[in-house]
From Swiss-Prot:
Stored HAMAP family: EF_Tu_B
Gene: tuf1
Ranges of residues in domain tr-type G: 10-204
E.C. numbers: 3.6.5.3
GO terms for cellular component: cytosol
Pfam family, one: GTP_EFTU_D3
InterPro entries xrefs: EF-Tu_GTP-bd (IPR041709), EF-Tu_GTPase (IPR050055), EFTu-like_2 (IPR004161), EFTU_2 (IPR033720), G_TR_CS (IPR031157), P-loop_NTPase (IPR027417), Small_GTP-bd (IPR005225), T_Tr_GTP-bd_dom (IPR000795)
Region G4: start-end pairs: 136-139
Subcellular location: Cytoplasm
Similarity field: Belongs to the TRAFAC class translation factor GTPase superfamily. Classic translation factor GTPase family. EF-Tu/EF-1A subfamily.
Residues reported in the UniProt entry to bind Mg(2+): T26
Stated role: GTP hydrolase that promotes the GTP-dependent binding of aminoacyl-tRNA to the A-site of ribosomes during protein biosynthesis.
Name of the molecule in the record: Elongation factor Tu 1
């Protein structure tokens, strides 16, 4: 059979497996690639190829992650699987592998376990928008009522964390049997793939979102005005459009009078491009690194937010000692460090290196932010943690 060439025409979606240790996440990942390759073409990946996950560094944090790809007739999927619980925590908080949807694997023999709950909570905190459930090891449960009970428990758990538990697709299967080529269970993998296609909507592309450019540098060009440079994070800015400068100080409205890239003039700057944007009537001192240029009204500056953070372990170059309430590090957003104070949850007195924790942060200056924005926690320029804005407060 000839090798399929990679089709860029298919919509691309990022997914991953989450769930309790030993419930079969990696076996399921192998089963999906194997069954879909057999059914629709593509390449299968063996369990041990996936299980020996290579180490990656994201924001200085060591994460073991396996990446596999597979196709359905409708879409191309990139799928992440992590060997250890700590890897999941780090992956979800740093956004190293952004997920448009997740497959929650729950062993029917065990039902929901502590990490099942923790992964659902993390999914809610870091903004995983959709979860599909795969009830695994159903070949080992003879009692239909027991399966009903486990399914009900999982649905209730999802609802508890504001996922639509009643409407979530739940597929009952056996990853191992499917991997062994048992047709009855292979059909369940196809059912799962169909659920991925139908339940997870096509993600919005960065270019279709409202314009935003984190400002990295500001120059004054005599006779022309002020130029800000940076990489367009999302959307498009066209010459002649109104834009806002947001963050740190009061928001200012201005107009984009020119866009240039590599000293060439353009009529627009698009997501992913490094550009200089010329601003009409804006003084050099009105703009600074750390602010963002954005479509008017699309983003607001905030100082207080709830976040989910991972604190680097000593081995990762993090702190050697715990920190307590009253800790005042810098929070690095996009291009700037801002000092902030923290509030720990009720009953949490200290946070150890290697822990993940929910905390409320109060910044001394407002930063343009939305839920889902990633940040680093730094002490004197050294990264000691990573976090994500779970919910803007004020």
């Amino acid at each position: 059979m000839s090798k399929e060439k990679f089709e860029r025409t298919k919509p691309h979606v990022n997914v991953g497996t989450i769930g309790h240790v030993d419930h079969g996440k990696t076996t399921l990942t192998a089963a999906i690639t194997t069954v879909l390759a057999k059914t629709y073409g593509g390449s299968a990946r063996a369990f041990d190829q996936i299980d020996n996950a290579p180490e990656e560094k994201a924001r200085g944090i060591t994460i073991n992650t396996s990446h596999v790809e597979y196709d359905t007739p409708a879409r191309h999927y990139a799928h992440v699987d992590c060997p250890g619980h700590a890897d999941y925590v780090k992956n979800m908080i740093t956004g190293a592998a952004q997920m448009d949807g997740a497959i929650l694997v729950v062993a029917a023999t065990d039902g929901p376990m502590p990490q099942t709950r923790e992964h659902i909570l993390l999914g809610r905190q870091v903004g995983v928008p959709y979860i599909i459930v795969f009830l695994n090891k159903c070949d080992m449960v003879d009692d239909e009522e027991l399966l009903e009970l486990v399914e009900m428990e999982v649905r209730e758990l999802l609802s508890q964390y504001d996922f639509p538990g009643d409407d979530t697709p739940v597929i009952r299967g056996s990853a191992l049997k499917a991997l062994e080529g048992d047709a009855e269970w292979e059909a369940k993998i196809i059912e799962l793939a169909e659920a991925l296609d139908s339940y997870i909507p096509q993600p919005e592309r960065a270019i279709d979102r409202p314009f935003l450019l984190p400002i990295e540098d500001v120059f004054s060009i005599s006779g022309r005005g002020t130029v800000v440079t940076g990489r367009v994070e999302r959307g498009i800015v066209k010459v002649g459009e109104e834009v806002e400068i947001v963050g740190i100080i009061d928001t200012i409205k201005t107009t984009c009078t020119g866009v240039e890239m590599f000293r060439k003039l353009l009529d627009e700057g698009r997501a992913g491009e490094n550009v200089g944007v010329l601003l009409r009537g804006t003084k050099r001192d009105d703009v600074q690194r750390g602010q963002v240029l954005a479509k008017p009204g699309s983003i607001k500056p905030h100082t207080k937010f709830e976040s989910e953070v991972y604190i680097l372990s000593k081995d990762e170059g993090g702190r050697h000692t715990p920190f307590f309430k009253g800790y005042r590090p810098q929070f690095y957003f996009r291009t700037i460090d801002v000092t902030g104070t923290i509030e720990l949850p009720e009953g949490v007195e200290m946070v150890m290196p290697g822990d993940n924790v929910n905390m409320v942060v109060n910044l001394i200056a407002p930063i343009a932010m939305d839920d889902g924005l990633r940040f680093a926690i730094r002490e004197g320029g050294r990264t000691v943690g990573a976090g994500v804005v779970a919910k803007v407060i004020e």
